[in-house]
């Protein structure tokens, strides 16, 4: 049943997946892993239910919070190929900059700036931005935390469900070890919470204690 629905999904490609991502999703639908689900599979299931994607739900949550703050200049770290999150927030009227090495194109949105570059906590100046957001930024996660802590910048970041290599080169044994390490690295600047952006999943959030 799912694979038949996938034919329609692939035709319209509502989440702007690459050819490889579509191919990988098709394989996962045919041979699902009972313990692990990809982000693309989750978005596919949400689409079947007529619900917003993970990025849309994250953006809607952030926009509701931003509306209660004075923040106008937003930096997204790790926007991915298509910078969907940044595009949504920019279209809502915020001045947004999105940085990632894999962004594939420029977008005709006046208040959206694309930086095709790597985010490094040692060199990136956050003084031009009011607030930093990131949705599962993978290897940039620790960079976001350290940059915001060092420059006293508020941030809101969802974490991947799997661990990533520390800047020291060590690999945490589990996602819980990874989350614990990040909290320790924050030196009290950040806190960890869990949010259900959709009815199918819960997401770990690392956020500054200031901001929202």
Regions found by a protein language model. Give the residues of each.
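A short glycine-rich, Lys/Arg-flanked "PGG" loop and its adjoining helix->strand segment in the class I
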Residues: 145-154
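Conserved beta-strand signature within the Rossmann-like core of class I S-adenosyl-L-methionine
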Residues: 153-167
């Amino acid at each position: 049943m799912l694979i038949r629905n996938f034919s329609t999904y692939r035709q319209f490609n509502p989440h702007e997946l690459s050819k490889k991502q579509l191919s990988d999703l098709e394989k996962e639908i045919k041979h699902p892993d009972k313990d692990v689900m990809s982000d693309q599979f989750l978005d596919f299931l949400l689409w079947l239910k007529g619900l917003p994607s993970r990025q849309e739900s994250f953006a809607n949550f952030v926009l509701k919070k931003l509306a209660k703050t004075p923040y106008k200049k937003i930096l997204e770290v790790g926007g991915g190929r298509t910078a969907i999150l940044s595009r949504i927030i920019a279209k809502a009227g915020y001045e947004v900059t999105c940085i990632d090495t894999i962004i594939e194109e420029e977008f005709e949105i006046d208040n959206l700036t694309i930086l095709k570059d790597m985010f490094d906590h040692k060199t990136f100046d956050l003084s031009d931005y009011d607030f930093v957001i990131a949705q599962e930024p993978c290897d940039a996660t620790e960079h976001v935390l350290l940059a915001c802590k060092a420059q006293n910048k508020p941030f809101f970041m969802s974490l991947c469900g799997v661990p990533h290599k520390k800047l020291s080169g060590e690999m945490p044994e589990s996602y819980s070890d990874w989350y614990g390490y990040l909290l320790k690295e924050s030196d009290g600047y950040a806190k960890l919470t869990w949010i259900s952006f959709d009815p199918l999943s819960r997401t770990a959030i690392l956020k500054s204690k200031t901001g929202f």
